[in-house]
Amino acid sequence: MEKPDRLQLNEAPWAPFGGKTRGIFRKSLFAVAFPSGFNASLTLAKPGGEFPEHVDSYTHVFYILEGEGEAFVEGQRIPLNSGTALTVLAGKRHGYRNPSPKDLLLITLNIYERP
């Protein structure tokens, strides 16, 4: 019997997101790569952290687990707090930040269009 892939997230290190982000870190939610056009990560925005506005060719779903922040989608400010789910369609300008004094923890789903 094949063993299921298991990832112990509390033991995995946080990786800086990179690029123009500031104070944003992530951990992959999968132990293996999925060829299906989908990935997910646990994302941490430290106090003052920011993912600058940008446009992607894929859809995001952000689900807030803990903390408070704010997203910007096509110029509209959207408050983020625990329990919020926000979908940003491909091609829409978006970004988010954590202006609060506490960590903002979210699940980020990236859904790529299949050819």
Language-model segment annotations:
Residues 1-37:
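A short, N-terminal "cap"/entry segment at the start of jelly-roll beta-barrel domains
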Residues 26, 40-56, 90:
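Conserved short histidine dyad/triad with adjacent acidic residue
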Residues 34, 90-115:
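Ligand-binding loop in jelly-roll beta-barrel domains
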Residues 34-38, 46-49, 68, 112-115:
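Short, charged/polar surface micro-motifs in flexible loops or helix N-caps
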Residues 44-46, 56-71:
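Short, conserved beta-strand element in jelly-roll/cupin
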Residues 51-53, 71-72, 88, 94-100:
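Short beta-strand His + acidic residue motifs that chelate non-heme Fe in jelly-roll/DSBH
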Residues 61, 68-70, 77, 93, ...:
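Structural motif
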Residues 75-90:
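Short acidic-glycine-tyrosine-enriched beta hairpin
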